[in-house]
């Protein structure tokens, strides 16, 4: 049990360690040499987490939520005559579509039900039929439900048809092993407050250098200009163009050190996976069924179907909060669900305590 007023069983923001919180008790200057050196170390560590072919990739940090970084990529990477195929089966894929439409980018959608993974056959059919598509985007872990999408197959198809690949790995990077060079991912986006277990305040983009260089002058926004942000960090030793979240960066650096101490991404994945499997098994015992088929389920967050018509999520939420737990409501339209996250500083004992608390307040059957 961590020293928190609530245990956040959510997909980020999430429960952080005491040591991550403690580094935010101090103040730093954005122009300080030591701080900028830390920014450079963070950038390098992220690339090393993403691939062994580190010389081919670089990292750009971007102020704001993860969505800001996604929009920075969409608005900077796709040229005026570009066209994007978006694979969507949840709120975050739909958000990418909305961004493209707001930025007047031509977009095609491959949509599946929220509990079904991206349909590779349909994706290939679209790529065969529409030769104008230049980019393809997919969400790795769609936290709307907790489903994992087949990014290996999507990126393989993307490269087979000569497309630039964009992967929203917001809720998976750092918790699921990904080699972006091996998967031929051109741009991967994630956030400080997800599986690396930092706090909210910035997102990051791990980009193939060759593709990033093509983005100069293409941005549709000043503050979300991915190329300019990178060029400043690259040429001015870690400096951000605009005020950076200094406390958040220090917390993230500490979180990276703690990820290494835990044993890296593989070890963290194992903990998350054990949490998720234990959660599902215990929840089944008291009558709750997961929405997503086991073979498509991520270790990040799990959606559970309301057991009966009389089930009152708000009542359960309030009872759990009194017991020191915070969970998530559902986010899909066709099935009543609620969600429980498995990531953050959460361990087996926490899962047992949570389900015991749920069982105390809910009688099914």
Swiss-Prot record:
Q: Which residues carry this modification: N6-(pyridoxal phosphate)lysine?
A: 194
The protein's required cofactor(s) are namely: pyridoxal 5'-phosphate
According to its UniProt record, which protein family does this protein belong to? Belongs to the class-V pyridoxal-phosphate-dependent aminotransferase family. PhnW subfamily.
Question: What GO MF annotations does this protein's record show?
Answer: 2-aminoethylphosphonate-pyruvate transaminase activity
Record bears the keyword GTP-binding: no
Q: What EC number(s) are associated with this protein in UniProt?
A: 2.6.1.37
User: Which Gene3D superfamilies does this entry report, sorted A to Z?
Assistant: Aspartate Aminotransferase, domain 1, Type I PLP-dependent aspartate aminotransferase-like (Major domain)
Organism whose genome encodes this protein: Bacillus cereus (strain Q1)
Task: Give the protein's function.
Answer: Involved in phosphonate degradation.
Protein name as it appears in the record: 2-aminoethylphosphonate--pyruvate transaminase
The record's Gene Ontology biological-process terms are: organic phosphonate catabolic process
> What keywords is this UniProt entry annotated with?
Aminotransferase, Pyridoxal phosphate, Pyruvate, Transferase
Tell me which Pfam families the record gives: Aminotran_5
Q: Which PANTHER family match?
A: 2-AMINOETHYLPHOSPHONATE--PYRUVATE TRANSAMINASE
Q: What catalytic reaction does the record list?
A: (2-aminoethyl)phosphonate + pyruvate = phosphonoacetaldehyde + L-alanine
Quaternary structure, from the entry? Homodimer.
Lineage at the top is: Bacteria, Bacillati, Bacillota, Bacilli, Bacillales
InterPro entries per the UniProt record, alphabetical: Aminotrans_V_dom, NH2EtPonate_pyrv_transaminase, PyrdxlP-dep_Trfase, PyrdxlP-dep_Trfase_major, PyrdxlP-dep_Trfase_small, SP_NH2Trfase/AEP_transaminase
HAMAP family cross-referenced by the UniProt entry: PhnW_aminotrans_5 (MF_01376)
């Amino acid at each position: 049990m961590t020293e928190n007023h609530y245990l956040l069983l959510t997909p980020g923001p999430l429960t952080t360690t005491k040591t991550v919180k403690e580094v935010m008790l101090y103040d730093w200057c954005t122009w300080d040499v030591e701080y900028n050196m830390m920014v450079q170390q963070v950038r390098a560590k992220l690339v090393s987490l993403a691939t062994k072919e580190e010389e081919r990739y670089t990292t750009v940090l971007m102020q704001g939520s993860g969505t800001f970084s996604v929009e920075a990529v969409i608005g900077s990477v796709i040229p005026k005559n570009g066209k994007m195929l978006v694979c969507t089966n949840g709120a975050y894929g739909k958000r990418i579509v909305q961004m493209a439409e707001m930025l007047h980018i031509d977009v095609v959608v491959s949509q599946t039900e929220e509990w079904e993974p991206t349909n590779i056959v349909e994706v290939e059919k679209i790529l065969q039929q529409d030769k104008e598509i230049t980019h393809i985007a997919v969400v790795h872990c769609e936290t709307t439900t907790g489903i994992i999408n087949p990014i290996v197959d999507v990126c393989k198809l993307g490269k087979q048809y000569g497309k630039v690949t964009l992967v929203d790995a917001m809720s998976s990077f750092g918790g699921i092993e990904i080699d972006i060079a091996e998967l031929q991912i051109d741009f991967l986006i994630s956030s400080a407050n997800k599986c690396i277990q930092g706090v909210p305040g910035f997102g990051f983009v791990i980009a193939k250098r060759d593709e990033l260089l093509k983005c100069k002058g293409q941005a549709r926004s000043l503050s979300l200009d991915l190329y300019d942000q990178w060029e400043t960090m690259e040429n001015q030793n870690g400096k951000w163009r605009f005020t950076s979240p200094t406390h958040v960066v220090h917390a993230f650096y500490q979180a990276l050190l703690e990820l290494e101490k835990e044993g890296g991404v593989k070890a963290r994945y194992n903990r998350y996976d054990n949490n998720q499997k234990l959660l599902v098994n215990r929840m089944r015992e008291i009558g709750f069924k997961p929405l997503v088929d086991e073979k498509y389920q991520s270790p990040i967050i799990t959606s559970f179907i309301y057991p009966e018509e009389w089930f009152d999520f708000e009542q359960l939420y309030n009872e759990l909060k009194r017991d020191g737990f915070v969970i998530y409501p559902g986010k899909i339209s066709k099935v009543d669900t609620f969600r429980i996250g498995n990531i953050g500083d959460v361990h087996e004992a926490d899962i047992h305590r949570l389900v015991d608390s749920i069982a105390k307040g809910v009688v099914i059957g």
